[in-house]
Structures are given as C-alpha cells and as structure tokens.
C-alpha cells in the first residue's frame, strides 16, 4: 500500500513537470494562465479519450518523461505509464521504449554471424519476428524485419537459387517471403530525437558512392554459392556413356573329354557328320543318362589351325567357347558300338519271329485229324452260345 502511494506521488510530480513545460511553451500574448489550465485539462483526460491522441514523432521531452517513468516503475504496466504522457497510449509507449529508448539495444549494423543466424531461424520459424528476436539479444523484431526485407531476403533467394541449380530441382517460389514494406509506421519508428539507426552509403571524394563492406561480403557470398552449385552439379551429373568393366563371370571354359584343352578348327565335313549322328546321340543319352561334352563349337573358332590363329572370338571373351546346339559323338568307337548293337537287336527280333512260326507249323503237323474235328466242333458250339447270350442281353 505504501509503495502504491509512493508511485502515485512520483507520477503526480512528473505531471507537474509536464504542466510546467507546457506552460513555458505558451503563446506570446501573456495569457499564461489560460494555457496552463488547458494543459492541465489535457493531461487529466489523456488516458481516457481517443480524440485527444497524439500521432506523429515523439518529442525530446516525451522521451525523457518515458525514460524516467520506466526507470522508476519498470518496463511494465504501460497503460499506467501512458496516463502521465498526454496523448500517448500504452502500446505507443511500449513500442517507443522497446524499439528506440531501451539502453540495451545494439545500434550497430548487423554482423555476418547475425545474418547467418537470421537466415537459419527464418528457414525454421518463417516470418515470426518476435520469436527470431529472442535468439538475438539486443535486436528488436522490427529491426530484424527491416533488415530482412532490405538485404537478407534477396541474399536468401540467390542462395536458394544456387542450391537448387546444384541439386537440379526447381527454383523455390518467393510467395512464402514477407512482402511487407521496409518503411515502418511513423508511430513506431519516427522520432524527432533521431533515435532510430539509419545506414547511409559511404561517399568517396570523387562524388561516387563506394560499396560498403556488407555489400562486398554479400557479393562474395553469392559468387561462392554459385561456384559451389556449379561444381556440385558437375559432380552429381551422370556420365553420358556407361562403360562396363570386363570381369570374369560364372561361365567356365569347357574342355574335351578325351584330351588337351587346346582349341582346333572345325572342319565342314565333321560338322555335317555330327548333324547326321545327332539322332543316335540323343538315343544314347536317353538310355545311359550321360551328358556328353562336344569337341567343337558352333562358331568355328576352336579347331586347330596351322598358323595357330583364331577365326572368330566368343562374345564372352577369349577364355570361353561357344558350342553347337546339337552335340556330336565323343568318339568314333562309340558310334560303331551303337551301330553294332542296333544290328544285333534287329537280327534277334527276326530270329524270334521265325522260330515261333516254325514251332506252330510243327505242332499242326503232329496233331491227328479226329482231334482237329472235335476241336472245330467245340469251337463252333462255343461261338453259338456266345451269340445267343449277346442277343438276349
């Protein structure tokens, strides 16, 4: 309770100071009392009515009163502080203090580290300038927004273009960026005391504008990103022609059953003879379930040549051999044995049929005539019985 009374007494003293300063700025007609009464009435109604609001730049006296009130009462309860400043609202007092009068503000130009932090934070939070301002002590959200719109947005766009060119993707759309104007409202930033920070270009003695270090660093950064994008594109682009490396596969060179692995030239007569004996070979393979390896290939590249040269190479390499579709006999002896077996089987079948016929003739000559007649009668009677059974059914 006592603290509240002390605050009210301090506010009353500040009001009197404001009234005295207003009376000192009265008309030259000598009607100082009327001016003082008007000022007193104006102070009394400043926090209640909106028709008495003051819009425009803050004066030096208003800045001093606001600084003194914040120093005594703290940076809180802005509506209560605004009652001591005629025509100013609590929001206006808060923005004026946070953006201009706070002694903890950093008024120097943004450093490269701060620029990188702003770009990284904007990629995460977007246009939430109050959240980004919490990451940079001494920088206000309004200052960060103005710096982004004036310098960093174009730099970020150029960086994204270079990155997209390097990755081969489409250029990012600019619709997500903040399109607000770089000029702040007069109530927030304008001041007659010159509180806001304004960067001006350096002018050389010849009268030409010299680029600042910030612009030089931006140009160097853009050139660097472009160079990195081009090199990255060269690294990621696939080669125009794919050249496979030759290597050994699962195929193995197949040697002959009889002998040496040296290739020899295939003769035309041998090829014809192998085609004639292909049917017999298939028969033998089915009988004995054996897999024969042919001695010659179908490309004509594995037969002996007096010069020792090859006429044709395999598609799989010099170590591989392309064989015929119809395999040949592994040896001439096997063909002779097969022929002999076939002739013996034919002779055996002929002998068996002739011996059966001779035996039947001998039995017919030895059988008597009576028995033959009795047998014929029995056969006829049996056939008649069978016919009657069929007709009855």
From Swiss-Prot:
Signal peptide: none annotated. Residues 263-274 have a biased composition (Polar residues). InterPro entries: Homeodomain-like_sf, Myb_dom, MYB_TF, SANT/Myb. Residues 1-57, 185-274 are annotated as: Disordered. Pfam families: Myb_DNA-binding. Disulfide bonds: none annotated. Residues 50-105, 106-156 form the HTH myb-type domain. Residues 78-101, 129-152 bind DNA. GO terms for cellular component: cytosol; nucleus. Gene3D superfamilies: Homeodomain-like (1.10.10.60). Keywords: DNA-binding, Nucleus, Repeat, Transcription, Transcription regulation. One of its GO terms (molecular function) is transcription cis-regulatory region binding. Induction: Slightly induced by salicylic acid. The keyword Nucleus applies. PANTHER family: MYB PROTEIN, MYB PROTEIN-RELATED. This is Transcription factor MYB1. It comes from Arabidopsis thaliana (Mouse-ear cress).
């Amino acid at each position: 309770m006592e603290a509240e009374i002390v605050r009210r007494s301090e506010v009353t003293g500040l009001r009197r100071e404001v009234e005295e300063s207003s009376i000192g700025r009265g008309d030259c007609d000598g009607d100082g009392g009327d001016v003082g009464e008007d000022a007193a009435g104006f102070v009394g109604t400043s926090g209640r009515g909106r028709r008495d609001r003051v819009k425009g730049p803050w004066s030096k006296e208003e800045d001093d009163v606001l600084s003194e009130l914040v120093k005594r009462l703290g940076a809180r309860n802005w509506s209560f502080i605004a009652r001591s400043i005629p025509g100013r609202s609590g929001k206006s007092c808060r923005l004026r203090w946070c953006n201009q009068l706070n002694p903890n503000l950093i008024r120097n130009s943004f450093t490269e580290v701060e620029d990188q932090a702003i770009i990284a934070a904007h990629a995460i939070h977007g246009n939430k300038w109050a959240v980004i301002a919490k990451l940079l002590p001494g920088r206000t959200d309004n200052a960060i927004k103005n710096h982004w719109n004036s310098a960093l947005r174009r730099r970020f766009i150029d960086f994204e273009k270079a990155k997209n060119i390097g990755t081969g993707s489409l250029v990012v759309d600019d619709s997500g960026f903040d399109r607000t104007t770089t000029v702040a409202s007069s109530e927030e930033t304008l001041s007659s005391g010159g509180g806001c920070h304004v960067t001006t270009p350096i002018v050389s003695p010849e009268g030409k504008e010299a680029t600042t270090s910030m612009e030089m660093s931006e140009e160097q950064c853009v050139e660097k990103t472009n160079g990195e994008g081009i090199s990255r594109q060269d690294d990621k682009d696939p080669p125009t022609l794919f050249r496979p490396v030759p290597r050994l596969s699962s195929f193995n060179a197949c040697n002959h059953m009889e002998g040496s692995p040296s290739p020899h030239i295939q003769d035309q007569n041998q090829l014809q003879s192998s085609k004639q004996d292909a049917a017999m070979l298939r028969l033998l393979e089915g009988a004995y379930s054996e897999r024969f390896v042919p001695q010659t290939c179908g490309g004509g590249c594995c037969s002996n040549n007096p010069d020792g040269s090859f006429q044709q190479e395999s598609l799989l390499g010099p170590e591989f051999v392309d064989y015929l579709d119809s395999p040949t006999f592994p040896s001439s002896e096997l063909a002779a044995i097969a022929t002999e077996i076939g002739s013996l089987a034919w002779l055996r079948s002929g002998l068996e049929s002739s011996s059966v016929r001779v035996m039947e003739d001998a039995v017919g000559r030895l059988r008597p005539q009576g028995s033959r007649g009795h047998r014929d009668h029995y056969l006829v009677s049996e056939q008649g019985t069978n016919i009657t059974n069929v007709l009855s059914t």
